[in-house]
Amino acid sequence: SLRGKENFFITEEKNNQEIYFIIAFAYVKKAAAMANKELGVVKPEVADAMIWACDQLINNTEKYRDQFITDWLQGGAGTSTNMNANEVISNLAIEHLGGKLGDYSIVNPNNDANFGQSTNDTYPTAIHLSCILRSNVLIKAAEELRDALYAKAKEFDQTLKMGRTHLQDAVPMTLGQEFHGWGFTINDEIENLRAAQEHLKIVNLGATAIGTTVTAAPGYPELAVKNLAELTGIDFKNSEDLIAATSDCGAYMTLSSAIKGLAVKMTKVCNDIRLLASGPRCGLKEINLPQ
């Protein structure tokens, strides 16, 4: 962790700014520890201590947030962050077992917390999960906006107004129809966000360094992703081709596109409302916005 902080002092922004990323990494490491315990490749008492440590990070994230010290931008595709997580989990586990911080003969960041794993499978899986958790917040806010627009559509379903194309009078419509159209277009983008989340549910956990599962115990990839799905309640599945998935960034592009789509649609709705509320004396003033 410290070497990573010193070597990659680039943005001066720590990755602990995104709390869902810490939670997501803890879930991934917990799923891994559970799998390694079941497969008998990590001592049960060590695995249980690491599982306990992961639960601390999941349930008391703010308490340990300052322990994640690496820069957002770093070489090695996230190796510094992966080791940061391994070291935090190991030291919490060591304390839980009654040892002294840094006594890696009890719980080792490499040989225990990272057993059968690589930055190249744990880090992207954690990003996938954190993107789902964070986009859920966005979806909830968008749903509240959509519902508010639909409520106004019902309120104004009998209010006649002039419909326009290119700012020229066209044909009559109700103000309710206009509000419903805004709500519907927001709902379209909500569905696109949900569709993007489906791509994020395909992960490469257990692929290890390049997708060949080298260093992972037989059966580990399937068991680890099963654990992750059960722990989070999200239907995660491993890619059919772990080698392809290890270097693929398509899910991020799909999510980014969906977020941009929502932003563009919201901009359009905002501009419509701003124009219709223009005035108060010389503009359209068809809509009164609350002060």
Indicate residue ranges for each PLM-predicted region:
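Conserved, well-structured ligand/cofactor-binding cores
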Residues: 1-291
